[in-house]
Amino acid sequence: MSDKTFEELGLTTWLVANCKQLGFKAPSNIQANTIPEILKGRDIIASAKTGSGKTASFAIPILNQLSEDPYGVFAVILTPTRELAVQIGEQFNAIGAPMNVNCSVVIGGIDNVTQALILDKRPHIIVATPGRLASHLNNGLKIALKFCKFLVLDEADRLLGEDFELEIASILEHLPPPEKRQTLLFSATMTKNLTKLDSIALNKPFIFEDNSKYDTVDTLKQEYIYMPAPTKDCYLVYILKKHEGSSAIVFVNNCYAVEAVKGMLNKLDIPSVSLHSFLDQKSRLAALKTFKSGKVKVLVATDVASRGLDIPDVQIVINYKLSNSSKDYIHRVGRTARFGRSGRAISFITPHDVSLIKGIEEIIKKQLELYKTDDDEVFRHLKEASTARKIVEIHLDEIEFGVKQKERRTERNELQKQLKEVNNKEKFENNNNDNNNNNKTKTTKPENKKEITKIQEQPSKSTTTTKSIEKKPTTIESKKIDKDIKRKENNFDDGEISLFKKKKITNK
């Protein structure tokens, strides 16, 4: 905490009062440093460790400014995961309750039409994952973003990576230019991505970097167990039974392994829920709700659960499989020992993980302690854990778990690759045009625009086909002929037909 009070940050009276009512005793270090600068109208690049109050650092000043002149879409907040978007939306609603703030969460897994209707009402705050918001914009939904005052990238190091490059670029096209908006970048880790800001174009930003961002809190006990890889399951069962009743998150590296571990634990009477990207949104929210409520004490998850999620009572974090990134370790263990509470993080180390542990110890500037185990007790669970795991994996293979999701992900990656190639081609041609004639302004080649549109509108693989309609010259008569042909064939340019139009044609 800082020595300042919320009153000293220049906030309105109602906001200070509500912060106190919500239990914010004093601003955290990142809040005390960034809120005044945001109120001055400056762009921000800020990083601080997990649990430092980053969300409130941008939510409070945005609501402060919104209360002075409420209108349309005032702020767009982008975040990499659905769960984090929901959580940010909840914080905006809580802090902005006295002014009846209208905050909409726009994420995948929710009905598109329902979201479009909500966005059409111009909420004050839009909290979104890039893919879903870009999809709405690219599909022609007219969201009034031209007067948006704030663009926030939470977990900016992730959002500025290649995974979200095209979606972010698409969203930026619909926002005001950098000089007419404030851009705020927040992250738990400062990476090279945050220094490569050509696409965001910040205006002399205020940069705040918490010197302790890689430090883990003193109340967190960090330990390791060295083991052969095939014995991980029996060690996991041993630890969870030993700490029965404690709330624990088990981090695994892929969706299939998450389901396998969760299924194994449930078969061994250790109630567990899972969280990963292959689950639909309803299942993800249900799993989080069940875990947060304490009905189930074990959450098995991928790194979807490692960033930003505020689950105050997590007592143990288990790294069943270490991430290849040392900084991901910091995000994971940051799920426990929050807000002054104690916690412990236990990492499973195989002979292949020794170099990873050295990298982690170097970045956190402390050595992990050995977690003492009773090996006789551990190996009593070996047979039952192994048997349960095999049964679950056979079932997952029978239902072809994740096959369709992987296919869709492969298609999406291929589409992104094609779009990137088209964009690079466009940039190359524009650069050549500039070199040939410096007096000409940069223009986008029409054929490239058509090519991008064609790629974006490619239908997913389907067994149905549509009849092609021969293009006629663009005269009034030919347009009429085209229209009659389309009605007759019950077909339209994009190969699809709306229910409204279909009904209209049928009635004729």
Curated annotation (Swiss-Prot):
It is an enzyme of class 3 (hydrolase). Residues 430-441 have a biased composition (Low complexity). One of its GO terms (cellular component) is nucleus. The keyword Plastid does not apply. The lineage of its organism: Eukaryota, Amoebozoa, Evosea, Eumycetozoa, Dictyostelia. The Q motif is unique to and characteristic of the DEAD box family of RNA helicases and controls ATP binding and hydrolysis. Residues 444-454 have a biased composition (Basic and acidic residues). Its EC number is 3.6.4.13. This is Probable ATP-dependent RNA helicase ddx49. GO terms for molecular function: ATP binding; ATP hydrolysis activity; nucleic acid binding; RNA helicase activity. PROSITE patterns: DEAD_ATP_HELICASE, HELICASE_ATP_BIND_1, HELICASE_CTER, Q_MOTIF. A motif (DEAD box) lies at residues 154-157. Pfam families: DEAD, Helicase_C.
